[in-house]
């Protein structure tokens, strides 16, 4: 095994979105250290925290079009019926919604819950209420992604929160996504909502811990053989 492989297998990868922030914290730590030694160590603690925040571990994703996989790490905070945001053009009838709340200690990379093509990406400005509140779905700043999957259209909504003031989505309209593929992140904790077609059966409960790219949120009830997975 090479030195590069050893380092890769020992340390959790850091997402490129974090590089400027990590470098900034480190430079500020050095500058503060010139003024007073204890300030350097305080700065280094913050730098390490920033590295931890932007960690991007590999995930083993089930490659099955009949499954809907969690787009975020965190706690399942809502399972039930809700009207999807108007910008998704999914109609005004309630759909099954599964919400995953991310705290400041969660991995903040968001992954596609299904394989499919992005129909649209719409950003909406708004408030920064506690993302655990139900009204955050309609009142908070959000980024809505509509995906045409093998089983129909699925809405994925990144919602800003009380601390999270920055939603990042690097995927665009007409992009093809693989299930479990990274498509964005929300800095410093928030929530991701998934709006499911009526024939999907939810497989999680409120309070359950979800892992992005691995936890099955729902399925379509089709009999399956041996699972096929992808590590990414």
Swiss-Prot record:
Keyword Lipid biosynthesis set for record: yes
Any single Pfam family the record assigns to this protein: PS_Dcarbxylase
Location within or outside the cell: Cell membrane
Cofactor(s) the protein needs: pyruvate
Annotated active site: 190 (schiff-base intermediate with substrate)
Reaction it catalyzes: a 1,2-diacyl-sn-glycero-3-phospho-L-serine + H(+) = a 1,2-diacyl-sn-glycero-3-phosphoethanolamine + CO2
Enzyme class: lyase
Pathway entry: Phospholipid metabolism; phosphatidylethanolamine biosynthesis; phosphatidylethanolamine from CDP-diacylglycerol: step 2/2
Mod. after translation: Is synthesized initially as an inactive proenzyme. Formation of the active enzyme involves a self-maturation process in which the active site pyruvoyl group is generated from an internal serine residue via an autocatalytic post-translational modification. Two non-identical subunits are generated from the proenzyme in this reaction, and the pyruvate is formed at the N-terminus of the alpha chain, which is derived from the carboxyl end of the proenzyme.
EC number: 4.1.1.65
MF-aspect GO terms: phosphatidylserine decarboxylase activity
GO cellular component: plasma membrane
Keywords: Cell membrane, Decarboxylase, Lipid biosynthesis, Lipid metabolism, Lyase, Membrane, Phospholipid biosynthesis, Phospholipid metabolism, Pyruvate, Zymogen
Superkingdom of origin organism: Bacteria
Lipid bilayer topology: Peripheral membrane protein
Modified residues (Pyruvic acid (Ser)): 190
Residues flagged as site, Cleavage (non-hydrolytic): 189-190
GO annotation, biological process: phosphatidylethanolamine biosynthetic process
Entry note: cofactor: Binds 1 pyruvoyl group covalently per subunit.
Function: Catalyzes the formation of phosphatidylethanolamine (PtdEtn) from phosphatidylserine (PtdSer).
Protein family per UniProt: Belongs to the phosphatidylserine decarboxylase family. PSD-A subfamily.
HAMAP family, sorted: PS_decarb_PSD_A
Quaternary structure and interacting proteins, as annotated: Heterodimer of a large membrane-associated beta subunit and a small pyruvoyl-containing alpha subunit.
Protein known as: Phosphatidylserine decarboxylase proenzyme
Gene name of this polypeptide: psd
